[in-house]
Amino acid sequence: NIILAANQAKAMVKDKDIIVIPTKTVPQGITAVINYVPDLSAAENEETMNAEIGNVRTGQVTYAVRDTTIDDKEIKQGDYMGLGDHGILSVGTEMDTVAFEMIENMMDDSLELISIYYGSDVDEQTAQALRDKVEAAYPSCDVELQYGGQPIYYYIVSGE
């Protein structure tokens, strides 16, 4: 557990004040960094960052390395999977369909911003097509698209 390791490292350092922000996903980490304000105290930044990471939902599209059943979903080796904060949100053989269904399952009326980070195995045109589909389906949300370049995860998506 990386958070446990960070807290152990914090306990070992005696000559510095260290605060661990317990993010569990890349989008939570990005949100924490965006909400850092240099003019605020460490305690104020910690409070703000912790509050904001609680508002982030994360989805990640990857592929199955073997046949399995998870969350009552039958998954075949090579299938695309949309993983959410609390389990599998979508499964299928078409990456973009799985990504869109994952986003649909992440959504509710409280979300205002959807950020899509596409990985090294997704071309820009494919990612833009997903963004366009999400924008059309959720016109009340701002939809951002960024090249993340990450391996393994075709898409990392945050909803805030």
What does each model-found stretch correspond to?
Residues 1-160:
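N-terminal loops that bind phosphate or other acidic moieties
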